[in-house]
UniProtKB/Swiss-Prot annotation:
Functional description taken from the UniProt entry: Could be a nuclease involved in processing of the 5'-end of pre-16S rRNA.
GO BP terms, alphabetized: rRNA 5'-end processing
Name this polypeptide is given: Putative pre-16S rRNA nuclease
Any GO molecular function: nuclease activity
Keyword set, alphabetical order: Cytoplasm, Hydrolase, Nuclease, Ribosome biogenesis
Family: Belongs to the YqgF nuclease family.
Length: 155
């Protein structure tokens, strides 16, 4: 039996790579083919573009939300972590869904490597570079799909 508030492993999730200017969004399910990048949401001085997030939420109707937890390579906190945790709490309050945090170390590097491979194969163009944030979110979702027990339920 899953922990109360946990995301069911066969549920659809939205994943988020939280940055100071943009938030990458991806969708994934264990029953599908992993995860895919779906949106890049702008962050303004007043906070994220909640109207855009509401549209993504309405389109995908997730069972849970996975937010990248930025740690340093030596497990130390970094300033971005406070922002990611605050965003995760806002998501939980707004959508009343379970929210988990998953280690996102090197997810942007992995996303950049994927992007470079896809560009070399002719599947991506340079102007698609903004989509890198959403690709990092897809990496985060894939990590959760591969090891949901490694996630931390947002307290």
């Amino acid at each position: 039996m899953p922990e109360a508030g946990a995301i069911l492993p066969d549920g659809t999730v939205l994943g988020f790579d939280v940055g100071s200017r943009r938030i990458g969004v991806a969708v994934g399910t264990a029953l599908g083919a992993g995860a895919r990048a779906v949106a890049v949401i702008n962050v303004h001085a007043s906070g994220p573009d909640w109207d855009a997030l509401d549209r993504v939420h309405k389109e995908w109707r997730p069972d849970g939300l996975v937010v990248g937890d930025p740690l340093t390579l030596d497990d130390k906190h970094q300033p971005a972590r406070k922002r990611a945790h605050a965003f995760a709490r806002q998501l939980r309050e707004r959508y009343a869904l379970p929210v988990v945090l998953i280690d996102e170390r090197s997810s942007s590097v992995e996303a950049a490597q994927r992007f470079a491979r896809e560009r070399a194969d002719g599947r991506k163009r340079r102007r698609d570079a903004e989509a890198l944030d959403a690709m990092a979110a897809a990496v985060i979702v894939e990590r959760w799909l591969a090891a949901p027990d490694q996630a931390t339920l947002l307290p």
